[in-house]
Amino acid sequence: MERISWNQYFMAQSHLLALRSTCPRLSVGATIVRDKRMIAGGYNGSIAGGVHCADEGCLMIDDHCARTIHAEMNAILQCSKFGVPTDGAEIYVTHYPCIQCCKSIIQAGIKTVYYAEDYKTHPYAQELFEQAGVTVEQVELDEMIVDLKNREKLSFVAGLIGKLADAGLAEEELKKIHEQANTLFTSYV
């Protein structure tokens, strides 16, 4: 059985964390990792016990939601709160960090940033990471890896295609169905 890569594993964790987001504008998750071990996670949302944007709407000041703590900051603050060092760690984020999070990541001593999607990627954030010697790499999440029924679905579809072939479906039609299955099961077919 083929196992998923560490990058895919930790990026999937960040996407799961993003599901806890209370921001209706963008759901973001972040996972801090050291030595292939998760040391903290965060998602964008309000302060503990505070009003959530999902309930009351965003509190916009200077085109930013003042109510929301970004996922990266939440993860870094979890480490700070519980005395877990971040020096030399890696962070996996669903979206490219904003300038403020970029500065916090650098100050926390995090050495590598993995992100899945560009989102308002600012050239100054890129410049700061480069100046600080922080490695930045895009790791797009293969969504198939978080589908817990993927193998069963793949097996089922392969069985159906086999039955269609046995039933005498035209080769051209079988080819079309197989191509459609390939797009659904990109990583595994």
Curated annotation (Swiss-Prot):
Residues in CMP/dCMP-type deaminase domain copies: 5-132
Residues annotated as catalytic: 72
Molecular-function annotations in GO: dCMP deaminase activity; zinc ion binding
Presence of keyword Metal-binding: yes
Organism of derivation: Bacillus subtilis (strain 168)
GO cellular component: cytoplasm
One annotated GO biological process: cytidine deamination
Alphabetized UniProt keyword annotations: Hydrolase, Metal-binding, Zinc
Annotated family: Belongs to the cytidine and deoxycytidylate deaminase family.
Names of required cofactors: Zn(2+)
One matching Pfam family: dCMP_cyt_deam_1
Protein's recorded name: ComE operon protein 2
Binding site for Zn(2+): 70, 98, 101
Lineage of source species: Bacteria, Bacillati, Bacillota, Bacilli, Bacillales
Function of the protein: Dispensable for transformability.
PROSITE patterns noted in UniProt: CYT_DCMP_DEAMINASES_1, CYT_DCMP_DEAMINASES_2
InterPro entries: APOBEC/CMP_deaminase_Zn-bd (IPR016192), CMP_dCMP_dom (IPR002125), Competence_ComEB (IPR013404), Cytidine_deaminase-like (IPR016193), dCMP_deaminase-rel (IPR015517), Deoxycytidylate_deaminase_dom (IPR035105)
EC number, UniProt record: 3.5.-.-
PANTHER family: DEOXYCYTIDYLATE DEAMINASE, DEOXYCYTIDYLATE DEAMINASE-RELATED
